Amino acid sequence: MRKTVNIVISGAATVLLGLGVLLNAPAAQAGGQAPDAKTCNDKDNPPKDAVTQGGCVVIDRAKGNCMGCHQIPGTTSGDIATKFENMAARWPDKAKLREQIWDASKANPNTVMPPFGRHQILSADEIDKVVEFVLSL
């Protein structure tokens, strides 16, 4: 009986420790999902890689706010536009994806997607980082 209790306690401790590690890891580190706001707003240790920086633009409601329309893993997201999954397979030409983000009305004049580049909502550098993030999904 004592051995069984020790095994159960040991197993529970292992599970809780694992959950603690997972919950404290930055979301972008998990891969395939958006970074969390804590990661994006960390002034002492800001994200350095383009994928995470692009993810931070995507979830920033004052900037990209992509999650307002798109389903993005790791966010509470919209469902009125294309779901962000298998993006590298769906957009094998990085330049075309960049052009879509820059000004989606060139491909579809009736789109509701804002022309992020043409209207200077995002800088060229921010768009490049968003492209890197989107292609990581």
What annotation goes with each model-predicted range?
Residues 70, 134-135:
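Protein kinase-like catalytic domain
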Residues 48, 67-102:
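Gly/Gly-Pro-rich "capping" loops immediately C-terminal to redox-active cysteine motifs
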Residues 1-40:
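N-terminal export/targeting leaders of redox proteins
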Residues 52-56, 82, 95, 99, ...:
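Solvent-exposed, polar/charged alpha-helical surfaces in well-ordered, non-transmembrane soluble domains
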Residues 61-65, 73, 126:
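Short pre-active-site segment immediately N-terminal to redox-active cysteine/selenocysteine motifs
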Residues 30, 77-87, 102-129:
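Axial heme c-ligation environment in periplasmic c-type cytochrome domains
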Residues 31-61:
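Electrostatic cytochrome c docking/interface patches
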